[in-house]
Curated annotation (Swiss-Prot):
The keyword ATP-binding applies. The gene is murC. It is found in: Cytoplasm. This is UDP-N-acetylmuramate--L-alanine ligase. It catalyses: UDP-N-acetyl-alpha-D-muramate + L-alanine + ATP = UDP-N-acetyl-alpha-D-muramoyl-L-alanine + ADP + phosphate + H(+).
C-alpha cells in the first residue's frame, strides 16, 4: 500500500537538515501538505520556502498548527517542545528513514550505502540514469551541483537514495538495488561493535527482493569478506582488482579530469564488454571507484555505453566534495567534507594527482569522540599534503576530552615524520600563512564537516583583498 494523500499536514522538526529537506521537497512535489521548523535559517530552509513550503525558525509547540503527522530525525531530542506537543496530541511520530521508505514505495529504488562515498556515488547514479532517459527521482545527502538541491522529482520509475547507516535505520529502506562502497568502523557509539556494523550491511544487501541485487566494492577487504557471506541474493562486484565483475582499468589523469576504461564481465557466460575512453571531471582513484559503482548499476538497467560515457563526462559534482571555491595568483582553493582519516587520505591523494604544485591541507577535526577513537589514523592520513594546518576541534555539541586536542594531533603528526604540520587558533591566521607559503600551481584544500566550509569560501577573497 502506498501512503495516501489523506494523511493531512506533515510537519518536519529539523526541516533544514540535509536528509530531512530532500524528503520534505519530494513529499511536497508529490502533492502532500508539508511544513516544518529548524533551529536556524539556512540555504536549505530558504530553498524550501521558495517552493511554497512554510518553514518556522525556532522550535515552539505552536509551530505544529494543524499538523497530523510529525517527522523527526535522530538528532531531535525528546525534550524538543514540538515533539513533546505532538506526543501530547497523540500524533503519529515518523522517523526520517521511515518516511524515506514510504517515498521509496512509489518507485523501484537504488539505495547507496557505505561508510564513505555515498553522496558522490548517489549523485553519479542519478546522473547516469538521467543521461539514459530514465528520469529518476533523487534524494541525496548533499547538494548536487547540477540540480542546486539535494532532491529531484522525476517522472521515471526509478528512485535513487543515499542510505545513511549511522543509526541503523537504513535497514528500513525497501531497495531493489543495494550498493555498498566500503565498510569502516564508524558509528560505534550506536552499534556498539564493528561486528554489528558488518551485520547491518549484510542485512542491507540481503533485504533486496529476489529479483534485485547488491553492487559491492571488492577493492575494500571488509566488503569483499561480506560478499562471501551474502546468502540467496545476486551480487555484482566492482573495483580495480582483476576479479571484479565491473572493473576499471587504465586510470590516468588529464589535469583534474580522470580518464579510464571499464571492463564488464558476465559471470554466467564469461563474456566481456569494454567501455573505453570514459572521462570523469574529478580527480582521484576513489572517485573513479565510485563512478564504477554507478556504471555497474546503469549497465544492469540497460543503459548503453554511449549514454554512460555522455552522462559521466557531464557530471558536475556535489557541493563540499572537492569543490573549487576560488583562485589567487595561480593558487587554487578547494572545500571538502572529508572528516574521517580514510576520506582525508583519499582527498589529498586526489589533489596530489591533479597538480604538479604543492598540496596544503587545512583541517578542522570534527567531534572530540571521533578524534579520540581514531587518533592514530588521523596522525597518519596527511602524508600527501606538503603542509598540514590544523584548526581547533569543531565540537558539534560535545564536551572536550582530556588529552584530545588539535594541538596534540599536530604533535602526533610531527612525531610520525611529517615535515610541516602547524596548529592555528582560528581562521584569521590562514590568509597570512597562505600568502607567505603558496606559489602558482599549489592547491589549498580545506577539510572538515564543521564551519570550515565558510573559511574555504572566504580565503580567496581575503587573499585578493590584501
Amino acid at each position: 500500500m502506498k501512503m495516501p494523500q489523506t494523511i493531512g499536514l506533515v510537519h518536519f522538526i529539523g526541516i533544514g537538515g540535509i536528509g530531512m529537506s530532500g524528503i520534505a521537497e519530494v513529499l511536497h512535489n508529490l502533492g502532500y501538505k508539508v511544513q516544518g521548523s529548524d533551529q536556524a535559517d539556512s540555504a536549505n530552509v530558504q530553498r524550501l520556502r521558495d517552493k511554497g513550503i512554510e518553514c518556522f525558525v525556532g522550535h515552539k509547540a505552536e509551530n505544529l498548527g494543524d499538523a497530523e503527522v510529525v517527522v523527526v530525525s535522530t538528532a531531535i531530542k525528546k525534550t524538543n517542545p514540538e515533539l513533546k506537543a505532538a506526543r501530547e496530541k497523540l500524533l503519529p511520530i515518523v522517523r526520517r528513514a521511515e518516511m524515506l521508505a514510504e517515498l521509496m514505495r512509489f518507485r523501484q529504488a537504488v539505495a547507496i550505502g557505505g561508510t564513505h562515498g555515498k553522496t558522490t556515488t548517489t549523485s553519479m547514479v542519478a546522473t547516469l540514469l538521467e543521461a539514459g532517459g530514465l528520469d529518476p527521482t533523487v534524494i541525496n545527502g548533499g547538494i548536487i551541483n547540477a540540480y542546486g538541491t539535494n532532491a529531484r522529482m522525476g517522472d521515471g520509475e526509478w528512485m535513487v537514495v543515499e542510505a545513511d547507516e549511522s543509526d541503523g535505520t537504513f535497514l528500513k529502506l525497501p531497495a531493489d538495488i543495494a550498493v555498498v562502497t566500503n565498510i569502516d568502523p564508524e558509528h560505534l557509539d550506536h552499534y556498539g561493535s564493528f561486528d554489528k556494523v558488518r551485520e547491518a550491511f549484510r542485512q542491507f544487501v540481503e533485504n533486496v527482493p529476489f529479483y534485485g541485487f547488491g553492487v559491492m566494492c571488492t577493492d575494500h577487504p571488509e566488503v569483499q569478506a561480506l560478499v562471501g557471506r551474502i546468502e540467496d541474493r545476486r551480487v555484482i562486484t566492482y573495483g580495480e582488482n582483476a576479479q571484479a565483475d565491473v572493473r576499471f582499468t587504465n586510470h590516468r589523469m588529464a589535469g583534474a579530469t580522470s580518464e579510464f576504461d571499464v571492463v564488464i564481465r558476465d559471470r554466467k557466460t564469461g563474456s566481456q564488454s569494454t567501455i573505453s575512453g570514459l572521462r570523469l571531471p574529478m580527480p582521484g582513484r576513489h572517485n573513479v571507484s565510485n563512478a564504477t559503482a554507478a556504471i555497474a548499476v546503469a549497465h544492469e538497467l540497460g543503459l548503453s555505453g554511449e549514454a554512460i560515457k555522455k552522462g559521466l563526462s557531464s557530471f558536475a559534482g556535489v557541493k563540499r566534495r572537492f569543490t573549487h571555491t576560488g583562485s589567487w595568483n595561480g593558487v587554487d582553493v578547494f572545500d571538502d567534507y572529508g572528516h574521517h582519516p580514510v576520506e582525508i587520505s583519499a582527498v589529498l591523494k586526489a589533489a596530489r594527482s591533479a597538480t604538479k604544485g604543492r598540496v596544503i591541507a587545512i583541517a578542522q577535526p570534527h567531534r572530540f569522540t571521533r578524534l579520540h577513537d581514531l587518533f592514530n589514523e588521523f596522525s597518519a592520513c596527511f602524508n600527501d599534503a606538503d603542509t598540514v594546518i590544523v584548526a581547533p576541534v569543531y565540537a558539534a555539541g560535545e564536551d572536550p576530552i582530556d588529552g584530545v586536542s588539535s594541538d596534540e594531533l599536530v604533535s602526533r603528526i610531527r612525531a610520525g615524520g611529517h615535515r610541516d604540520a602547524r596548529y592555528i587558533e582560528g581562521p584569521t591566521a590562514i590568509a597570512p600563512i597562505i600568502r607567505g607559503l603558496a606559489k602558482p600551481g599549489d592547491f589549498v584544500v580545506f577539510l572538515g564537516a564543521g564551519n570550515i566550509t565558510q573559511w574555504a569560501y572566504a580565503l580567496p577573497k581575503e587573499l585578493a583583498a590584501s
